[in-house]
Amino acid sequence: VSQSQKQLARENLLEFDKQGCNLFVRVNDLDSAFVRDDLACLEKCGEVGIMLSKSEDPHAITQWLEQHSVTRQILCLSETVMGFAHTSALMQHENVIGCAFGHFDFSTDLGCEADISLLAPYRADLVLQSKLHGKAAPLDCVTADISQIDQLKLDCVDAKRRGFGGKLLIHPSQVKPAQSIFLPSKDDYEKAKELVAVTASQAVIQFEGRMIDKPILKKAEQLIEKYDRLMESKVFDAHR
């Protein structure tokens, strides 16, 4: 958001219907002159989380939270080399629930091209650190060209295969295509339930011609749990 539009963005947030939403609001980084006004706006918004730009120092986050008497959940944006180097420490912070990758700022700071294939090792480490510290699977970086929905879908498939739980989006037109990749379908849900039921009722080691072992069974159970959770939240339409 440009400097001239920041106050309008805060006013729009106050008017946004937040009922039924697990909402996180991106705020300016802790060194920014705008973060105080961002926080003042959030204080009027009820139980919304913070997506913290350029998250770098867990100790600075603690001091900032204590100074402003804030107890909100935080989603860290990994956008700098320093922040990436502190990923493990950030993921251990009690207020932090997960992270997301901002590849444009990160590549600028690192001095490389903003090519997600070149940044694959850093993306993989965010997935690893999130899992290691029991946090939510991270959100992958944006697809900047909003006219290229097919590319967005390819990027979502790639992110999902790498272990990301979702993707940062920059335009409403990207929401449904991304959901179609990351959210379990009704067919996937029913097939997972059938697999779990069959393996529970008999000593089956094959399902639809495929060998079933513990990792495959666990993935099916995770899909069922995710689908049920999303349906209960009523935020997403998982009945595609």
Model-derived regions: residue spans:
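Expand to "…catalyze enediolate/carbanion chemistry for C-C bond making/breaking, isomerization
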Residues: 1-240
